[in-house]
Design a protein with these regions (language model features):
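Positively charged, polar, low-complexity stretches
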Residues: 2-144
Length: 144
């Protein structure tokens, strides 16, 4: 994909949500986020095997004390408090999710639903919250 494609996509608040992203497209996404002046945070999920660890890693990249986000329903309010006032959007990139998907697929799905809810909440205020789960191209078929 091209930076121009991502640039246009990120500007469309109504389309913001959770998406799977091929590894080869990460650099273009990061560049498009910079063009749009959207903060882009990356979460390395290598070795992550459950909800508590996942929430801890997300809290860590947002520099939120771990006790602030201990469940999915606490995620949206925490992220809203951290939103930069002059930014029309935010990009979250989740990388190396293989271990989590293998060990706790239900928690992975719950996380995606929570992030989708954050996107919907932000979109209601004309703000874009994008989440991208980076996958190797061969993993797309396994998602079903």
């Amino acid at each position: 994909m091209a930076v121009l494609w991502f640039d246009g996509l990120l500007a469309r608040v109504a389309d913001a949500g959770v998406y799977f992203l091929p590894e080869d497209d990460v650099d273009e996404l990061l560049e498009a986020a910079a063009v749009n002046r959207f903060p882009c945070l990356r979460v390395n999920l290598a070795g992550c095997t459950g909800k508590a660890d996942l929430l801890l890693r997300i809290a860590g990249v947002f520099a939120v004390p771990p006790h602030v986000v201990q469940d999915w329903d606490q995620l949206a309010p925490a992220l809203e408090r951290l939103r930069l006032a002059d930014s029309a959007g935010q990009v979250l990139v989740l990388e190396h999710s293989e271990d989590l998907r293998a060990a706790a697929l239900g928690e992975f799905k719950a996380a995606m639903e929570a992030l989708q809810a954050v996107s919907a909440d932000w979109a209601a205020r004309d703000l874009a919250f994008w989440s991208f789960v980076v996958l190797d191209e061969t993993q797309f078929d396994a998602l079903g």
